[in-house]
């Protein structure tokens, strides 16, 4: 917390042994940052601007500069993986993608990822939550990670009546019949 990279003040930050004593922490982690405040009224109407890459594309177009392309990975090699039990049960949802990851042994995010999330107003939680939040900020695509031991049958649907739902931030929200929910079978687990 003292060096301005996290709200976490619970303990001592570990720095690898290859960093010499007395090294400025700014040379170890990406702490210094430039903040652009963009008053963009079209953000809500332009989903392509919801992420950092979309904003960068807009800036590149306005400045007449080339945009560094994203590295694209061929996902077809994952086509043979076992399918996740997922069904879209409402035409309001046009697409929902998911993949199951196993054998994740690391739970703590890299420090630079936690720093970037902190600068974007988000707190680090764990590796998978931080990764989905990081990608959401980068690409503008909301994501969520579920524990496959607890969520077995993903269903995307609406409910006939409104109900209360407590989100991860602890806020109880009123969900109306027009809101798509991600469910474990018939039990809502996310909006």
Residue spans for each PLM region:
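Loop/turn positions that initiate beta-strands
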Residues: 1, 125, 177-180
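Active-site lining segments that contact anionic ligands and/or coordinate catalytic metals
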Residues: 33, 151, 178
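Active-site-adjacent structural elements in folded domains
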Residues: 40-43, 100, 167-168
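Glycine/proline-enriched, intrinsically flexible loops and inter-domain linkers
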Residues: 63, 67-164, 171, 182-187
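Phosphate-backbone binding interfaces of nucleic-acid-interacting proteins
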Residues: 1-76, 190-191
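Residues that scaffold, gate, or flank divalent-cation-dependent active/transport sites
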Residues: 174
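Short beta-alpha junctions and helix-cap segments that line functional grooves
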Residues: 167-169, 177-178
């Amino acid at each position: 917390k003292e060096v301005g990279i996290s709200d976490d003040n619970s303990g001592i930050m570990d720095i690898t042994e290859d960093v010499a004593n007395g090294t400025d922490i700014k040379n170890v982690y990406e702490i210094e940052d430039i903040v652009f405040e963009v008053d963009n009224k079209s953000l809500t109407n332009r989903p392509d601007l919801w992420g950092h890459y979309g904003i960068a594309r807009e800036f590149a177009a306005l400045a007449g500069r080339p945009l560094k392309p994203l590295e694209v990975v061929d996902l077809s090699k994952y086509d043979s993986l076992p399918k996740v039990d997922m069904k879209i049960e409402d035409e309001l949802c046009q697409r929902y993608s998911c993949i199951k990851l196993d054998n994740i042994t690391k739970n703590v995010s890299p420090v630079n990822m936690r720093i970037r999330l902190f600068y974007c107003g988000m707190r680090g939680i764990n590796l998978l939550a931080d990764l989905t939040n990081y990608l959401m900020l980068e690409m503008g695509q909301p994501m969520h990670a579920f524990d496959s031991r607890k969520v077995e049958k993903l269903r995307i649907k609406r409910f006939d009546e409104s109900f209360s739902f407590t989100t991860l931030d602890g806020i109880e929200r009123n969900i109306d019949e027009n809101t798509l929910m991600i469910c474990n079978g018939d039990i809502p687990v996310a909006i």
